[in-house]
Amino acid sequence: MARVKRAVNAHKKRRVILERAKGYRGQRSRLYRKAKEQLLHSFVYSYGDRKKKKGDFRRLWIQRINAASRANGLTYNRLIQGLKAAEVEVDRRMLAELAVSDANAFAALVQVAKDSLPADTSAPAVSAEAAPKAKAAKKPAAKKAAAKKPVAEEAAK
């Protein structure tokens, strides 16, 4: 049986791995075994992060919609509730795009949502200019002074 020589294939395989690991730090870009291990981890991260990116964008859209709807006097939750009641089918991606690029159209949608909501007195009112809450002033350290007096009296006795 003829001898199989694999030097060319082995060198090509290693070269491809090291080329793909270019840009990694330290041994991970220079040593084949470390580079191969890092590439396997990188593939796992890239797969997972492609899934994670969808949730990240959804959270970003919700933040943008919430900020714009509060500027128009309605919370995000009430806006979505009102749009569903009005049977307006606009997804969060488009709402966020409208909130950023076309404020007048977004304000019109907020008005549609407000009109379709039932008059609910228990719902919190959101003002267009929400004032930051003032923190309560701390009380002076009267307790510490009162606690020290008996100790001082006992020492005097």
Curated annotation (Swiss-Prot):
Record has DNA repair as a keyword: no
Region (Disordered) residue spans: 121-157
BP GO annotations: ribosomal large subunit assembly; translation
MF terms (GO), sorted A to Z: rRNA binding; structural constituent of ribosome
Function as written in the Swiss-Prot or TrEMBL entry: Binds directly to 23S ribosomal RNA and is necessary for the in vitro assembly process of the 50S ribosomal subunit. It is not involved in the protein synthesizing functions of that subunit.
HAMAP family registered for this protein in UniProt: Ribosomal_bL20
Protein name: Large ribosomal subunit protein bL20
